[in-house]
């Protein structure tokens, strides 16, 4: 018999891990709710036509396609195989697992536009799937935790995303992080300025890999996309623009002086910083990063990434403004902006930094140990009453040897045990044992409740 295993890039989560994940998700969920976001869910699978063409060619290749039911190769001819996967896939697959939550959200908005109040603020916490190469912090199945606003182009939404990020990380105990922000209009302006107008998509896809493959490899990739040595030479100074906004923006305005779209991007970025400061977050951990590109093709305005410092991990949040994502589904001119929290990466960072609280409050607090069938039956109503008082209580399911029952409590780190023998049952005085200190007391039932609440 073949030994069972998991697909690469996927994981099981045991109780200890799930309690931590629930704490993390609930903390962020409460922040979303505070800012007026409401929850939705969408199916794990979407029609393939909904997903393809929204993430660029590289993203499309990472979508998990679902083979058609039955004889899925029926109708496939030799020429389809020779023409490559783009011709073959539509013949054998009509559905796919969702790649992210943003595109399904756009589809949801279009299908439910008559029932939605705009601006529509939604959050969504569900798994997504990507046929990526697994490595530290990168999985094939992972949880996304998104918040988006659609139906307004107000830059207040971008500012509130930054505020929400800061509040969420403060609640989680993460203090050493930076929010990187750029604007896709600036990147379009840079393409214009170096004489490569209309090539911002290729530029963004390449720049997005800067942290992964380095500057030289990015330049080589751009050469393969038709960028000349002269154009790349003019691009290099932009990579090196560092400092605060008072230093960066004047230089950038000079570089992009002939690009109206680039100048508009600078104006938008400055307005976002002003709104953040006016909201009272003057010491925000936020910086302009002109090499931030976000490879996804649907972004049109502000783009965000969050990195936790002094930890070997990629970005833990990402998002941006998209002006016409719903347009491909027949609802044009609906602007939106959103952020996605990388729950799995944040979880790994919090584990590494030991930021999760003790799990004692979420687990069993008292184990009732009965000696025999009579004391077992006597304990049943006690369990119900203790639970009604809000005390997490278990009754060991079999009246076996007390040593085995206490071993169970020890393995589950249950702090108290209530021992009920024949004498205890008859006297109404029970032995309450503190399994951490070893102390043991004789108590009435009411005293048990009083000690554990």
UniProtKB/Swiss-Prot annotation:
Record-linked InterPro entries: aa-tRNA-synth_II, aa-tRNA-synth_II/BPL/LPL, Anticodon-bd, Anticodon-bd_dom_sf, His-tRNA-ligase, HisRS-like_core, HisRS/HisZ, HisRS_anticodon
Biological process (GO), any one: histidyl-tRNA aminoacylation
Chain ranges passing through the membrane: none
GO CC annotations, alphabetized: cytoplasm
Signal peptide: none
Enzymatic reactions: tRNA(His) + L-histidine + ATP = L-histidyl-tRNA(His) + AMP + diphosphate + H(+)
Keyword annotations: Aminoacyl-tRNA synthetase, ATP-binding, Cytoplasm, Ligase, Nucleotide-binding, Protein biosynthesis
Protein location: Cytoplasm
Pfam families named in the record: HGTP_anticodon (PF03129), tRNA-synt_His (PF13393)
SUPFAM superfamilies: Class II aaRS ABD-related, Class II aaRS and biotin synthetases
EC nos: 6.1.1.21
Subunit (UniProt): Homodimer.
Similarity comment: family membership: Belongs to the class-II aminoacyl-tRNA synthetase family.
Entries under HAMAP family matching the protein: His_tRNA_synth
Protein name: Histidine--tRNA ligase
Organism of provenance: Cytophaga hutchinsonii (strain ATCC 33406 / DSM 1761 / CIP 103989 / NBRC 15051 / NCIMB 9469 / D465)
Gene expressing this chain: hisS
